[in-house]
């Protein structure tokens, strides 16, 4: 689950980290009022969406009057912001963050993730702030500094000082950076985060450090023990199909292809997507119905896949272990009848009751293409999607 920038900065402030004075507003009038509350003669207004690249898309602007702040809010509230990280429809803007203006001398990067290989929280810092950190990691990996946090003792001040020295900070900046580093590490652990970024972490003209941005992603598996963060969830930023899938305990991720995929098991689902790509197709989704799939969940999975107008064909790839193939077959038949499927459906069944499942499908009288292997299934569904 992601948080908006203004929500992330609220958490930063609770941990004593330096952030800009600002207000998240819902109306153009509130945007103008926020300028009065903040004071000064210049403000930064930011559209709040769960996506990067807002600045290049016109979603971040420096304004020099209350009227301009109000006009910006009128321009974006209720509209969708399209960035390089969104799909063609963009993300809806329901809040605008109005902040005081910051005089920047230098931009740094500071972030943290859970490193699966070491099973530790790893902090990353770089002098290349304000840019895409993935690009820095690819082009100049030597510019990214890393520190691993011991889960037994947590982040230590000496680790913060070491990073500060390597970033070229001096004097009070070292103390400030260490304070920010330790605070972010505590926040990361307290709230079960999966990712945290301050990009950029800036050195102001007066030499002080300042958190100019906040990106926070929470481990969804830990939300049951984070009621405060659950309350911060903005459902408007979720893909409607993904939200519906979550209610049925289905793992669904929307993609941009035209071949719908329904598979049991995350590994098999990824393998299925790979082989579809290998044969020239483009998956429209990742969908794992799980090991404990029921007929009802399979029916809902089918509905979710077919709710995507881009889907030209559907591939169902089931390996029956815990899940019986005949039950999956009944779910497919039920969904096809209920939804009124108008696209080709290719089914590959293997394992528990696979022969019975194939028989159920064959006797259904529906136009379902049976595949003999995974390769055959991929080839057939790619042809079907192309109308061949």
Curated annotation (Swiss-Prot):
Residues 9-244 form the ATP-grasp domain. One of its GO terms (biological process) is succinyl-CoA metabolic process. InterPro entries: ATP-grasp, ATP-grasp_succ-CoA_synth-type, ATP_grasp_subdomain_1, Succ-CoA_synthase_bsu_CS, SUCC_ACL_C, Succ_CoA_ligase-like_bsu, Succinyl-CoA_synth-like. Mg(2+) binds at residues 199, 213. Pathway: Carbohydrate metabolism; tricarboxylic acid cycle; succinate from succinyl-CoA (ligase route): step 1/1. Binds 1 Mg(2+) ion per subunit. Keywords: ATP-binding, Ligase, Magnesium, Metal-binding, Nucleotide-binding, Tricarboxylic acid cycle. It catalyses: succinate + ATP + CoA = succinyl-CoA + ADP + phosphate; GTP + succinate + CoA = succinyl-CoA + GDP + phosphate. Its cofactor is Mg(2+). Substrate binds at residues 264, 321-323. The keyword Nucleotide-binding applies. Heterotetramer of two alpha and two beta subunits. Belongs to the succinate/malate CoA ligase beta subunit family. Succinyl-CoA synthetase functions in the citric acid cycle (TCA), coupling the hydrolysis of succinyl-CoA to the synthesis of either ATP or GTP and thus represents the only step of substrate-level phosphorylation in the TCA. The beta subunit provides nucleotide specificity of the enzyme and binds the substrate succinate, while the binding sites for coenzyme A and phosphate are found in the alpha subunit. This is Succinate--CoA ligase [ADP-forming] subunit beta. It comes from Pseudomonas aeruginosa (strain UCBPP-PA14).
């Amino acid at each position: 689950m992601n948080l908006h920038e203004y929500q992330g900065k609220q958490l930063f402030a609770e941990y004593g980290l330096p952030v800009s004075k600002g207000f998240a507003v819902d109306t153009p009038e509130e945007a103008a009022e926020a300028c009065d509350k903040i004071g000064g003669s210049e403000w930064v207004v930011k559209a709040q969406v769960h996506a990067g690249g807002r600045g290049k898309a016109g979603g971040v602007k420096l304004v020099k009057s209350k009227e301009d702040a109000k006009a910006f809010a009128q321009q974006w509230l209720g509209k969708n912001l399209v960035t390089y990280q969104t799909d063609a429809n963009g993300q809806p803007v329901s809040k605008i963050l109005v902040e005081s203006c910051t005089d920047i001398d230098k931009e740094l990067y500071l972030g943290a993730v859970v490193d699966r290989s070491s099973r530790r929280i790893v902090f990353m810092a770089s002098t290349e702030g304000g840019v895409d950190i993935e690009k820095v990691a690819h082009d100049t990996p030597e510019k990214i500094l890393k520190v691993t946090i011991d889960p037994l003792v947590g982040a230590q001040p000496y680790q913060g000082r070491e990073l500060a020295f390597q970033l070229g900070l001096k004097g009070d900046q070292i103390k400030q950076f260490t304070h920010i580093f330790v605070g972010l590490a505590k926040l990361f652990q307290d709230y079960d985060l999966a990712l945290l970024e301050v990009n950029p972490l800036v050195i102001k003209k007066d030499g002080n450090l300042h958190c100019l941005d906040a990106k926070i992603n929470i481990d969804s598996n830990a939300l049951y023990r984070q009621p405060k963060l659950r309350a911060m969830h903005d459902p408007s930023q979720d893909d409607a199909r993904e939200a519906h899938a979550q209610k049925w305990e289905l793992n669904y991720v929307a993609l941009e292809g035209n071949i719908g995929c329904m598979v049991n098991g995350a590994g098999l689902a990824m393998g299925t997507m790979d082989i579809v790509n290998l044969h020239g197709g483009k998956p429209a989704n990742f969908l794992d119905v799980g090991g404990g799939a029921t007929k009802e969940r399979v029916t809902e999975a089918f509905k979710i896949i077919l709710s995507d107008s881009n889907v030209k064909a559907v591939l169902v790839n089931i390996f029956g272990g815990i899940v019986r193939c005949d039950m999956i077959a009944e779910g497919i038949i039920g969904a096809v009848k209920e939804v009124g499927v108008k696209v080709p459906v290719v089914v590959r069944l293997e394992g528990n009751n696979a022969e019975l499942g194939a028989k159920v499908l064959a006797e259904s009288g529906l136009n379902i293409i049976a595949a003999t292997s995974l390769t055959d299934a991929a080839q057939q569904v790619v042809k079907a999607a192309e109308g061949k």
